[in-house]
């Protein structure tokens, strides 16, 4: 029988983030102690009022509009306009089963080339590969807070020589946990060259200091804002995300609606109705407590690992760190991460999965291996956190960091 799988698809591997989680679970079943620092999932419960809204609407069983429930689209537009000072209307919003699907369909639609900062989230590049879009990487470094400079972006646009291009910009960043500080300068270059920006703002509500700033404020006509419930609302398994697309990109939006109709049809009705509660109710206390915990845990990991053998940028949002290890033993970050897992039980994702050159000893560390329900329940309100709280409610983080520190010092 001839091969029934297309050659292109046969070259793909499972998503690195999902693969490391499955590998960790297999090791745990064999009796090995594993510190699950490889999988990025919010450890916190969905806010009670949002859960109750889902229960209340569980009987909703009709197909909804391919673009999404109009009431939900309206409240998301208002939410963005209030929090980000945007000017979106309900017709600018498209609801999807997570932003990942919407990004994939956008890659299929887009007639041009893709610009990705390295590091970037693990699925941008494979999606571009499937869609047969050429990817242009911009290598960044800790000195630029793991974001590209405006000059780097302009040089890359010029090298593409007149082709349409789209820049994926994720802040707070997965995998580095840093926040982009040069949005205005990037926006000026994008506007000058009519570059489309896909602003992946899934972690925006988990910015630790100050109010989150969106690049859409500086370049509204060319920026697609992408976000959803998975990170700030602890609802990764609910699979609800959205795109906010400016009227100037009407053709892209209309094409995306067509692909939505020919793929997932519409997002789960009960989830969409429950999401109205998420975007209209006051979740400020919940978010304050969640950010307090994440900031404390992230800074604990940073302070205990940052040294002359491990270089890390201070966490600014989300729940990741991107340590760079100093050693000459390994030829690739993949080899290094396998050694760490084998010798310490600490599961990390190699920097090469995020577009970083293999010979750079970088890895993503997700500091969410703890019971967020207990941590949140017992430390909410004005309670100031200390290391005793960490040892009590996040022992895997404490022990895993100790193991990783011991491993790094062995070199």
Give the ranges of each region predicted by the language model:
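Helix C-cap/helix->beta junction micro-motif
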Residues: 27-30, 131, 189-193, 308, ...
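Conserved core segment of the aminotransferase class I/II
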Residues: 221-292, 303-304, 387, 401-402
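Hydrophobic residues in well-ordered beta-strands that form the structural core
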Residues: 116, 137, 197-199, 350
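N-terminal small-domain helix-loop-helix segment of the aminotransferase-like
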Residues: 3-97, 280-281, 374, 388-393, ...
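Active-site phosphate-binding strand-loop segment of PLP-dependent enzymes
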Residues: 142-210
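Conserved PLP-anchoring active-site segment centered on the Schiff-base-forming lysine
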Residues: 109-128
